[in-house]
């Protein structure tokens, strides 16, 4: 009998509500038993998404996962990550590009055709593989890899047409996932050593698009590395920690931040023996609110876990096998990839969103100072947890900079615009607009920049 004790756990399994929310999609591709799982998927909205597989396939759905079509099958690739910058332009990353150097794939037509990114468009060393992608807006996307080294960070500011690559192996052993709030601020996770026996959990933070990185967390234990990131709000985020089987530590942890990634603290979720049978070795982590989330594993058919209190306690969820990625489209809909694809629908929240829309669910205050130079504060208020997108628009309707794109909790918030565009370049004096969009409504304010 497996000797597993979840820390601070109440042994009441939440089958009721959770089983109604998560469902396995019957027509989704199933990973072969020898490959165990699909590593990533990405949805632009509630119906349109892409799934990548370890055998080099990219699948597309336009009906919320009811049906799937194969868009690409490249047997030379091990597809590890995928992201879309807009409805047409997407990027997929290959984990094992050692010999063919086919590390990046791109599409300009929503996946009708995919092509290998020409290495001549990559400035710097060509990465050997990628594990994570983070798309910020229609022009900006970041990537990193690999989980077993060497460690590379890549970025594009022109929709994937050209790339910059940075070899970070002198200071980092492995890079696995990353998350950017905007074109400047982001975090990246992995391990201190490319050899798992010597690796410690690592979190890096940047405020200048990855020109430089600050180490904000290093784990105390060896045989651990960061795996996946989830930010349900601007300030609250979570990181799963994968633990190597047979490691000495008998307690497994995850990380949490409450200040937007500047500092992190670990929380235990499981006590176990040191045998492989009893290791959870978490991979996927995904929170739809600051307190409600899930965590997955691929070791020995471990169950997906669920928390309702921000990770203080965990129970077995009623879905998922080998879950590696969990993504949420809005506050009532999400998808997860593992042995197959799973879909989350909170019908209560969806019905409220559809039938009880109130005109005053959000407010966007005038920025201050206004006019401004060089930066300005833009306050806004949410009356409930919402998916929030905040963009700076010029007078021609073009998006200059994206300041927020994700779930945020109810209450008062603010963002800061530094008078720069998505590439970090200073914009000229003139009239600009701040547009706040949620699932229910949008508000726009005029902003004056004076140089």
Where are these regions (language model features)?
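Repeated scaffold domains used in trafficking and secretory/extracellular systems
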Residues: 36-40, 78-83, 127-133, 173-179, ...
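Blade-level signature of beta-propeller repeat domains, shared across WD40, Kelch, NHL, RCC1
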Residues: 324-349
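Short glycine/acidic-enriched loop and turn motifs that connect beta-strands
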Residues: 96-100, 147-150, 192-197, 243-248, ...
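Sec-dependent N-terminal signal peptides
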Residues: 3-12
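Entry beta-strands of beta-propeller and related beta-repeat scaffolds
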Residues: 47-51, 88-92, 139-143, 184-188, ...
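C-terminal outer-membrane/trafficking sorting elements
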Residues: 357-368, 372-451
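Asp-box/BNR beta-propeller loop motif
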Residues: 17-30, 56-72, 103-121, 154-167, ...
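Beta-strand-rich domains and repeat architectures in extracellular enzymes and scaffolds
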Residues: 31-46, 51
């Amino acid at each position: 009998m497996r000797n597993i004790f979840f820390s601070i756990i109440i042994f009441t399994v939440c089958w009721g509500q959770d089983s109604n929310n998560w469902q396995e999609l019957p027509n989704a591709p199933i990973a072969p038993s020898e490959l165990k799982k699909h590593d990533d998927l990405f949805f632009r909205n509630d119906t349109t998404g892409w799934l990548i597989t370890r055998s080099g396939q990219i699948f597309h759905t336009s009906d919320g996962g009811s049906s799937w079509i194969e868009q690409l099958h490249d047997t030379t690739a091990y597809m590890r990550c995928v992201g879309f910058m807009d409805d047409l332009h997407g990027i997929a990353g290959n984990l094992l590009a050692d010999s063919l150097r086919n590390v990046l794939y791109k599409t300009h037509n929503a996946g009708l055709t995919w092509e290998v990114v020409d290495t001549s468009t990559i400035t710097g060393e060509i990465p050997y593989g990628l594990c994570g992608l983070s798309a910020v807006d229609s022009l900006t996307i970041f990537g990193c890899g690999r989980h077993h080294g060497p460690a590379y960070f890549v970025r594009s500011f022109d929709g994937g047409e050209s790339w910059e690559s940075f070899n970070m192996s002198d200071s980092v052993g492995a890079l696995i996932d990353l998350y950017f709030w905007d074109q400047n601020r982001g975090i990246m996770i992995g391990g201190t050593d490319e050899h798992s026996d010597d690796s410690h959990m690592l979190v890096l933070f940047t405020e200048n698009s990855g020109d430089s990185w600050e180490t904000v967390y290093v784990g105390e234990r060896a045989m651990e590395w960061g795996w996946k990131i989830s930010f349900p709000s601007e300030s609250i985020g979570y990181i799963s920690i994968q633990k190597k089987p047979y490691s000495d530590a008998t307690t497994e942890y995850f990380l949490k931040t409450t200040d937007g990634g500047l500092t992190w603290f670990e929380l235990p979720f499981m006590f176990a023996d040191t045998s492989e049978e009893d290791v959870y070795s978490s991979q996927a982590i995904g929170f739809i609110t600051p307190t409600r989330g899930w965590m997955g594993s691929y070791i020995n058919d471990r169950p997906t876990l669920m928390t309702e209190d921000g990770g203080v306690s965990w129970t077995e969820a009623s879905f998922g096998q080998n879950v590696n990625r969990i993504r949420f489209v809005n506050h009532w809909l999400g998808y997860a990839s593992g042995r197959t694809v799973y879909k989350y629908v909170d019908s209560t929240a969806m019905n409220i969103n559809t039938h009880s829309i109130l005109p005053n669910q959000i407010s966007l205050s005038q920025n201050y100072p206004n006019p401004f130079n060089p930066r300005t504060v833009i306050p806004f208020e949410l009356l409930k947890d919402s998916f929030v997108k905040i963009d700076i628009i010029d007078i021609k309707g073009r998006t200059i900079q994206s300041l927020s794109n994700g779930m945020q909790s109810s209450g008062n918030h603010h963002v800061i615009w530094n008078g720069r565009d998505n590439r970090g370049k200073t914009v000229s004096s003139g009239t600009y607009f701040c547009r706040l969009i949620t699932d229910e409504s949008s508000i726009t304010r005029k902003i004056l920049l004076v140089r």
